[in-house]
Each structure stands twice: as structure tokens, then as C-alpha cells.
Amino acid sequence: MEPLNRTEVSEFFLKGFSGYPALEHLLFPLCSAMYLVTLLGNTAIMAVSVLDIHLHTPVYFFLGNLSTLDICYTPTFVPLMLVHLLSSRKTISFAVCAIQMCLSLSTGSTECLLLAITAYDRYLAICQPLRYHVLMSHRLCVLLMGAAWVLCLLKSVTEMVISMRLPFCGHHVVSHFTCKILAVLKLACGNTSVSEDFLLAGSILLLPVPLAFICLSYLLILATILRVPSAARCCKAFSTCLAHLAVVLLFYGTIIFMYLKPKSKEAHISDEVFTVLYAMVTTMLNPTIYSLRNKEVKEAARKVWGRSRASR
């Protein structure tokens, strides 16, 4: 056998959409607009939930955290992706690749848990209305979100360290437009079983388990709604649950496709398309589906905007 050509890695080449120049020219204005809408929408929701005292409730605390996650997640890859769409040199340093991998894993994992926590909050609000404020106290909200942030960060750092310490051989071309951990692992010439097993275990804990919890919560909510005598109230509550469930299905469905699908040695353009869908469309739609259609949020936004104009 020939010895493995191990080299010290200083940078990676992100293949991305290199083979599709027409697609690159189309994606740049589209992704730029989506990125701007994502930042503006989520920043507005986060600001309103903090500045308006009437929104200092558990549901808007979690919505504020969701907006914070979306604001933290998209800058981990979108600005560099936009630069690469216009550039012929699509490289990323080893250190930046590791940071990008860690932050994207951490924020994505935290959002998985946040969606489950939000489903539990919806269940308590609809199914246990008299005990809601006792069961879902502010202290519990902070503890749940703090635990989610810390645990997912530790998990992501561990996955990144295990993966990036592997030896890399031959070309350093990542068949993706970001440093996705599965794409980087394909370049490793060492034993990747430990990293893959750790990643699979984390995927199972953060995908099927929370998703099953969310589905159970919504089934209990639906059963409660069907017992509500008022048809108008029933329809309103049911439509709200459908909106939340739509985002959950979009978010979890794309992740499950990317991480739990059968392995393939060749990269497919569908990976990139689904990653854009998961990473950008969901973060852009979250403010609209979760908050901007809510009358309380609209009223709070008008009050905050009015106070800001009056103070000038």
C-alpha cells in the first residue's frame, strides 16, 4: 500500500455552487435579500419583546430566544457564502472553518430544543391554563433556555474538536458551501467512526426525541381544542398550532434529510438546496409565522415605534 499523503491543513476550498455559475448569479441577490429580511425581522421581534413590558411572558421570552438564535446562526455562514458567490477564490481558513462548524452546530441544536420547549409551553398554556403561570415560571424559563444553550454548546465543541483533530489527506475541497461537519469528515484519512458515532448519537437525541415530544404536545393540544365549545376560539387556536407545526416540520424535516439519510460518496446539489432551505428560509419565516401575525406583537411594535419617534 502507498503511504497516505497527510498534509498540514491551513485552509479548505469550499466547492459550493462552483459548477453552477448561473445559479451563483441567481443566488447572490436572493440570499442577500433573505439575509436582510432575516436580520431585520428577528431584530424587531427581539427588541419588541424586551422593550414592551406586556410581552414579558414565557411565550414571548421563548420567541425572543428564537429570534436571538436566528440572528446568531445566519451570520456564521451567510456573509462568507455571499462573498464566495462573487469570487473565484472560495477558501476558508482551518480556524474559521472550525468556528463556523461549532457555532452552526450549537445554534441549530439549541433551536431543536427550543422548539420542543415552546411546544411544552403551548401545551401548558392551552391544556393547563389555570396553573400555567405557576408551572411555567420565569425562573423555569431561564433555567430551561440556559441549560439548552450550555448543553448544546458543549456538545458542538466536542463534535468539532473530535472531527478537526483527524488527519486530512489529498485535496482539501469541501463539497459544500459551508464547513458542514459531514462534508469535512469525508476529507479525513483517519478513523472517523468515533466522530460519526458521536454525531449520530447527538442527532438522535436532538431530532427524533424532541420531535416526538413536540408531536405528543400538539396531539394533546388538539384534543383540548376539540373540546372547546366556542367554534371561533377553536379555529383560532387550531390555526395557531398549524402555523407552529409548519415551522417545526420544515425545520426538522430538512435536518433529518441531511443528517440521517443514507451515506453517499458523491455530493449532490440537493444537499446545498436543502441546507439553504433549512438555514435561510426557516429563519426568515420564523418572525412572520410566530410573531408578526400576532396582534399583541403588532400593537407592541406600534407602541415602541411611536415612543421612539416621540423621543426624537
Swiss-Prot record:
InterPro entries: GPCR_Rhodpsn (IPR000276), GPCR_Rhodpsn_7TM (IPR017452), Olfact_rcpt (IPR000725). Residues 1-25, 76-99, 161-197, 259-271 are extracellular. GO terms for molecular function: G protein-coupled receptor activity; olfactory receptor activity. It is a multi-pass membrane protein. It holds the Pfam family 7tm_4. Keywords: Cell membrane, Disulfide bond, G-protein coupled receptor, Glycoprotein, Membrane, Olfaction, Receptor, Sensory transduction, Transducer, Transmembrane, Transmembrane helix. Its main location: membrane. It comes from the Eukaryota. Glycans are attached at N5, N191. Residues 47-54, 121-139, 218-237, 293-312 are cytoplasmic. GO terms for cellular component: plasma membrane. Belongs to the G-protein coupled receptor 1 family. Odorant receptor. This is Olfactory receptor 13J1. It comes from Homo sapiens (Human).
